[in-house]
């Protein structure tokens, strides 16, 4: 697929999440430990400034937002950009707006408790307590954020710097070659996700005494819900295997109650794994 076609089908999405670390390096204690043990460069003592549990709800929202971001995007380079299919943009924007709202609410709740948490820390830390370790409430709010940004997929044809034609052509080729490699990597990522959910189904269902959670099937369903959109390169083999994986989406309780159905589903999963083998990766490298 050419970059120009990909530019029509997808964009780059970046997710930035910041949170207060709730840690502070105590140089005095670190030096004291080294003196007591006659050690050098032995480590760092980091204080936990407030009760860890007070930040858990914020961390959970951040983790869920990050998981969703990775679920509906594909890898694209190593600078934090991810490839977001245009077909998923509206869902992405709405979901992220929800995450941002939840995140803001949890941060506000934390800030309401923050003065009391600092007082508790004064008692808990004893002589390790240092007032300047704790930002003011107004500054603390700025330590938390969920931000998203979007950009078009770059193309060699977009490069228009005033240079010698020879250098311009070379840079354009390098950009297009890099894009081609990134496209291949994005398709391989799709195949890896498919193999993972099918492999998990086979592993858990192949033995009658293996227990499994409902998420075994739910995770596969979640992937298939976005896989057609993630297949931005139009890989026909990926589209074909997606339909076959849907046959594995049997209600979990039926699989627990019906040994024959469970065995048959495990067999289908095994056949799909055999069909994919390493072919999923090789096919995607050829068709990307």
Provide a role label for each language-model segment.
Residues 51-75, 138-154, 185, 189-192, ...:
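Amphipathic, heptad-repeat alpha-helices with coiled-coil/zipper character that mediate oligomerization
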Residues 1-141:
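Leu/Val/Ala/Ile-rich N-terminal alpha-helices, chiefly Sec-type signal peptides and the beginnings
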Residues 85-208:
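Long amphipathic alpha-helical segments with strong coiled-coil/leucine-zipper propensity
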Residues 3-4, 25-53, 158-170, 177-192, ...:
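Charged, low-complexity, helix/coiled-coil-prone segments
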